[in-house]
Amino acid sequence: MKSPAPSRPQKMALIPACIFLCFAALSVQAEETPVTPQPPDILLGPLFNDVQNAKLFPDQKTFADAVPNSDPLMILADYRMQQNQSGFDLRHFVNVNFTLPKEGEKYVPPEGQSLREHIDGLWPVLTRSTENTEKWDSLLPLPEPYVVPGGRFREVYYWDSYFTMLGLAESGHWDKVADMVANFAHEIDTYGHIPNGNRSYYLSRSQPPFFALMVELLAQHEGDAALKQYLPQMQKEYAYWMDGVENLQAGQQEKRVVKLQDGTLLNRYWDDRDTPRPESWVEDIATAKSNPNRPATEIYRDLRSAAASGWDFSSRWMDNQHQLNTLRTTSIVPVDLNSLMFKMEKILARASKAAGDNAMANQYETLANARQKGIEKYMWNDQQGWYADYDLKSHKVRNQLTAAALFPLYVNAAAKDRANKMATATKTHLLQPGGLNTTSVKSGQQWDAPNGWAPLQWVATEGLQNYGQKEVAMDISWHFLTNVQHTYDREKKLVEKYDVSTTGTGGGGGEYPLQDGFGWTNGVTLKMLDLICPKEQPCDNVPATRPTVKSATTQPSTKEAQPTP
């Protein structure tokens, strides 16, 4: 007797079932995860709070990175005994009981270097190694050397690293690319996910999930062997992002997973803790106190979740675009995150096929197709003509255009006609003399106008090229590179972010001074230099005039062919 055709509810149930299979395959590994290191605000309790509130250091990150010289419980007991004694000096107590982080040696580049020479010379300067750390150090050890962004940062950061690795690959440092992939795989195996950075106080959240793209990058050099080698870690990271999905009812959210009323599964940013961030303790407390109409824990969670997004902070997350205390990151479903999840599912399908598991490859393809439909249905603003985030509170797509709207193009998830509209919107609303604006809002936050960030320039450039919009892509690359070159000519450094309303000016806003170095700017600059200059005539500095698209070199893409929506 012929079996009846499966009903629609059975088909919808396939999606959680696929994910559940991934969880089952990883259950043994999950049981081996060691105890999570405790962050300094938990280890030191009231002492940590008092030191940060006393503002002993200009940068709150300083004490978060300080290493206790003995058991933190003993230090805390001594503090409780001494703190109320006459003449107690908190700064002296800290100096005696902690080793404070040292400022790195200031790098002075040789005279007369071209932009390319300067970047190539920075790779060893930015390389760190922490195979072993002190027992109570907030720094988490990693087995291989890694490249830090630069400036105030002494640790590796998750999503920064992908764009840094693009530059390392462009410079031929495939050994460093392999080392960094191995480090992130180690973190997945050790902690169940890749934290924001290799610090104990970053373990409660991740960042934009680029690990699968890192493995795909390494596969350009090592072939499918890299995909097969790191398939278990990619699956485990996917399980982290989808954790809790099997118990979700329609209209519910659990940690990083959102299930809409029609069963569509999407993701959001989330931090497991709802306390002030140790590295920005005083600032977070002040933000929470400034809005007594909201529970402080809710604001702390949304601040932390915005840090997980990489966009800390932006009007993108706020109800009032000029008041940080109105941010509500956890009730927003980001278009860039879901584009990256789509890409992760596509790479998992490719890796599963390479490993000979066609059934699992088909499962991941099913998940990717379902997510793509969700992005097109819920994250396209037809009235405005651009992609945007989905609002869980209003149950509709938001109106604000941000550079995150280019991510569906970057991962080849956009419909062709919508990609064309995105090209128009980008040129009309975001393109500036110095590159691509992050948003059109001047809020004073660093992920808003007039700042432009290297990773978003590259995502936009690649995304537009994927859909044949090479002129707009060239405009973005050319404007941004000119900005980078002018700043380098004047200051002999590459910086974290740029003011794109002009050229030759570093960006402002944020919780700390402008940082130089700078990993992802170095990586994107090298990629763009090799994109705009012909292979037979590579350029070491940005050309004085805008190249024509005809003479520009189109690099081979590792992305899948553009799907039919």
From Swiss-Prot:
Q: Which family does it belong to?
A: Belongs to the glycosyl hydrolase 37 family.
Q: Which InterPro entries match?
A: 6-hairpin_glycosidase_sf, 6hp_glycosidase-like_sf, Glyco_hydro_37, Glyco_hydro_37_CS, Trehalase_periplasmic
Q: Species name for this entry? A: Escherichia coli O8 (strain IAI1)
Give the EC number(s) under which this enzyme is classified.
3.2.1.28
**Annotated residues for binding of substrate:** R152, W159, D160, N196, R205, S206, Q207, R277, P278, E279, G310, E511
PANTHER family assigned to the protein according to its UniProt record, in alphabetical order: TREHALASE (PTHR23403:SF1)
Q: Name one GO molecular function term.
A: alpha,alpha-trehalase activity
Question: Which GO annotations describe the biological process of this protein?
Answer: cellular hyperosmotic response; trehalose catabolic process
Identify this protein by name.
Answer: Periplasmic trehalase
Which HAMAP family has this protein been placed in? Answer: Peripl_trehalase
Which reaction(s) does the protein catalyse, per the Swiss-Prot or TrEMBL entry?
Answer: alpha,alpha-trehalose + H2O = alpha-D-glucose + beta-D-glucose
Relate the protein's function as given in its record: Provides the cells with the ability to utilize trehalose at high osmolarity by splitting it into glucose molecules that can subsequently be taken up by the phosphotransferase-mediated uptake system.
Polar residues bias (residue ranges): 548-565
Q: Keywords, A to Z?
A: Glycosidase, Hydrolase, Periplasm, Signal
Quaternary structure, from the entry:
Monomer.
Where are the catalytic residues? D312, E496
Would the keyword Hydrolase be found if you checked this record's keyword annotation?
yes
Principal location class: periplasm
What is the residue range of the signal peptide feature? Answer: 1-30
